[in-house]
Amino acid sequence: MEFSSHAQSNIFNVKNGQITFFSSTPIENIQAKTQKVASAINLDNGDIIFKVKINTFEFAKKLMQEHFNENYMESDKYPFAEFKGKILNPQQIKGNGTYNVDVSGKLLIHGITKDYITKATIVLNNNQLSTISNFDIKLVDHNIKVPSIVGKNIAEVIQVKIAAQFNKVEVN
């Protein structure tokens, strides 16, 4: 991944991006959110990275947050989730506008790395860039085990939404 700056920087970063996830079952819905996502995007070559500390996700119920960190995600053992990838068609992003792009990369969660391809929307407006992406994660793909006693309360597939407002990296 290449994020070195040059005179005409096309690199954008953010330290307070947002990730929400949603689990829907007939018994209960569970939602969590963090606004502590760090990310960088290089529009010249399409490189993209997102990184989040697992224990920053907040739940409506403290007990859910505790179970999430201690029992399911084991956030002491696996403190971060990270996506490294590429915008597959970065050359289409020319000037201000809204762009629908394909993103491919590797998602590391719970010590397991899997390949993902998803769609994202990028809005470029001068020195600011915003992104939105929605995708699903299967718990089994990342070896996240849910005890059978609560298995009906947690979906096997979690809906994830990433949204971030980036600023252009200033070059000295």
What function would you assign to each model-found segment?
Residues 1-6:
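C-terminal segment of classical bacterial N-terminal signal peptides
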Residues 7-172:
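Low-complexity, acidic/polar, glycine-enriched regions of mature
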